[in-house]
């Protein structure tokens, strides 16, 4: 934890410096590689960790080495992870998907924005200094057309996005030759179907069935295609966003880049303060990952924070505004029905979802049904025109383990299942949001009920937190639940930072939350038996046993922390080649002793074998050549 607290001005200045000096950066001893596909422009980025050779014998003067294969890993950092790419935040990222979108011929550019709010913002000269300079001309579907990846999948079309994803999900594991690295324990998949090789056709089939989504708004061409579904790698979302009391555009862009560097598969912009529209534009134009939002937050800002004053018209305008900026998925709390609100009265912590509480208050104040539920088909029509995926929000999720798995939570889940089928009528992609606070023994029921009632649509959960006693450490309490529900079939995990329940996370909190959740997601992939998931673990274990310290650092999810902890006690360069660490020292290192035992056993076997042969030779009379019948 930092000893000195920066002022707001210092925080903004530091973030501005980060943006101004930003350049593509690789992790230590890693390089960016690209694997090409058959579609034009399909060039899938991965990070390849270079490893040092293993000493296998020889003398001090002439040592003999065996090369170790480089390890390819999934990389979410986009252009920010490629030192060869010039980064300019003022101009935004290259529009990777634009040629694919244009080639389909089913979209048209808008000459006028559909949102009245957007028109007003663009006409306000006072915002010129804040506004992103290269504003994208938005597109929407041509009349009578649907432009969603679900629509294409149902038509039997394999899009470039689907091929990109198939290559990405395989993680280059076909390159690995070593049997030691390829070894993997059988998993327990709880009904998930995990093919040995993921093909573009498999991706298409999963999307067509609604079991997976590809969040890819046609107005966010900068994003690199990714997929969310239980038959693929478990994904992690990071939340960023300003508030009414803290943060700035510079800091949010910095957090975006930081999040993608540390493994965020998607990022949600939960801004609730000033300049939400402008902040989101900067984020989208510089994001290589899908961006999600909760539109009700901004709609509430438009009515001065008074939930009772919300209207469908204001909300619809917000959907159009965000869809034309390029938001890839909306969290919509359409399952908070008027009749469910009384079910929360006996809860210890009531309704803890911001979106859920806003809609509950609106329902009660008007004594009318949730307008998001009433206008859900119109919401779907908007999403189908831009390919905005729906993340159906769990507004009645439990906010304490006492309230876990209660009547209100599962009543809403049933409704989300009904809404899923309606969205699919419009070829709109859907995932389902889940809890929350759930003790370990009650977690699996959440997954089984979601699969049953929501027709196997992907599940996306916040944790869940497995205990309520650890403010400041809720990335741990929730990481436990996240690993479990990921194993049971959850497709994406929303990270929790150390600041959960305490305050808005800063840059370091974002990193801590992401590392915790990347661990949880990877542990779930291992437990499910996802093909190739164990390769990196095997490489790490081999490096550890062979005392290849640099390789251990570089294979870690966080190489910098691993190196720093090692160097606290063994900072000298000699410590990087030592056959021990400070935990046990040179005399009691279990791996060093194991190596000695292995070497001793091998030597003994050879010596015993030679002794046996010598004795046999003497027993046969010491003759060099034996008669055929004696041989």
From Swiss-Prot:
Entries under Pfam families matching the protein: ThiC-associated, ThiC_Rad_SAM
UniProt-annotated binding residues for substrate: 239, 268, 297, 333, 353-355, 394-397, 433, 460
Pathway: Cofactor biosynthesis; thiamine diphosphate biosynthesis
Binding site for [4Fe-4S] cluster: 581, 584, 589
Its biological purpose: Catalyzes the synthesis of the hydroxymethylpyrimidine phosphate (HMP-P) moiety of thiamine from aminoimidazole ribotide (AIR) in a radical S-adenosyl-L-methionine (SAM)-dependent reaction.
Entries under PANTHER family matching the protein: PHOSPHOMETHYLPYRIMIDINE SYNTHASE, CHLOROPLASTIC, THIAMINE BIOSYNTHESIS PROTEIN THIC
Family named by the database record: Belongs to the ThiC family.
Name of the molecule in the record: Phosphomethylpyrimidine synthase
Source taxonomy: Bacteria, Pseudomonadati, Pseudomonadota, Gammaproteobacteria, Enterobacterales
